[in-house]
Amino acid sequence: MKKQQFVFILLLLLPFTGCKSVVKDTVVEPVVQVEKRQTGVLFERKVNGKWEWHEVGDETKDHKYVGKIENGKPHGRGKITFADGEQYVGKFKDGQKHGQGTLTTPDRDRYVGKFWHGEKHGQGTLTTPNGDKYVGRFYHGKKHVQGIYTFGKGEWGGQKYVGEYKDGKYHGRGTYTWSDGRKY
């Protein structure tokens, strides 16, 4: 009887033998990438046909940037003055105009609006010194899709085009209004 009880207990314990649960002490360390963020001055110039950012430069020849810097490139809010006098104030991403900003050319053309990877892209307003004004969408730097162009001074002063654009030109449906009220 005792032998049978012993065998019975062994049979009950049998499923638990050989089933060993091993929990290893594993330490998981997060990978932390340290980004160098700062505010400062950078200079952009062409080297072997490619634009590059440098900490030292010549203000008379290079483009000068003042603002937020991340990993050696403009990133965040800043201002760049180009060698020809053109100026951009706004957001940057990875060294390019990206987001909301204002671009003013040496001829005093002024664009206020969205930029995407360095180009006018999205909703914006372009004004010229003679009073011409375009309000609408841009695609890769050109007037595109829908916009309103109002002529300022000069021969066409007071005239307006409301309609579609493609690649910077009137294209598709639109209405042209002369200063005397005639429409086409």
Segments from the language model and where they lie:
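Glycine/tyrosine- and acidic-biased, solvent-exposed loop/turn segments at the edges of beta-strands
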Residues: 18-184
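Classical Sec-dependent N-terminal signal peptides that target proteins to the secretory pathway
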Residues: 2-21
